[in-house]
Amino acid sequence: MRLPPLIAGTLVRRYKRFLADVILEDGSPVTVHCPNSGSMKGCASPGSRVLLSRSANPGRAYPLTWELVESDGCWAGINTSLPNRLVREAIENGTVVELRGYDSIRPEVAYGQRSRIDLLLEGPAGRCYVEVKNVTLVEGERALFPDAVTVRGQKHLNELMRVVREGDRGVIFFTVQRGDAESVSPADAIDPEYGRLLRLALDSGVEALAYRAVVSPEEIRLKERLPVIL
């Protein structure tokens, strides 16, 4: 996925979940939209280099959106609206070999208990429900999810277990939007219930896929699979 021209700045603070104050390279202070509702642990330190996109909509209250942050010497993608598109692109171009062979991909399809699946794949082999997660927290060389307690994420695991019981395929897809991770694990110290449900889901037939992205100011694309270590 190609990115638009990005604007560089320095993070002052992130607050109210969806706002951040940034100093641009010319010294101008701006308030920008933060498209991430998680804790952003490790990715929201004051003084970090950030890259912003500019909206073409003149009516937006905050025309700049925070896209990337430099964390531990590498760029990390914090925009949680991108992973679904990244995964779909990678499925369509054949990068995700485990999800080849489906004829159609539909986003945001209603299912379960008032839920929407990120991607529904359909083909001769049946249906595959893919729930996509954005991963930016890294400790050592291990990416961890979630970075905050996620009741919604717990619900998604229960929904995937249900579709597997009904005979369909269910996949939890961890999109690691940074290049310094070598594996993915549940963040048990942050959300032990999510870790418990993830292990239960995998024992129940849900599949876990994790792919690391190449992240640069010019593009973000999924490149290679990482092991999921429980």
UniProtKB/Swiss-Prot annotation:
The gene is sfsA. One of its GO terms (molecular function) is DNA binding. InterPro entries: SfsA, SfsA_C, SfsA_N. It comes from Pelobacter propionicus (strain DSM 2379 / NBRC 103807 / OttBd1). Belongs to the SfsA family. PANTHER family: SUGAR FERMENTATION STIMULATION PROTEIN A. Pfam families: SfsA, SfsA_N. HAMAP family: SfsA. This is Sugar fermentation stimulation protein homolog.
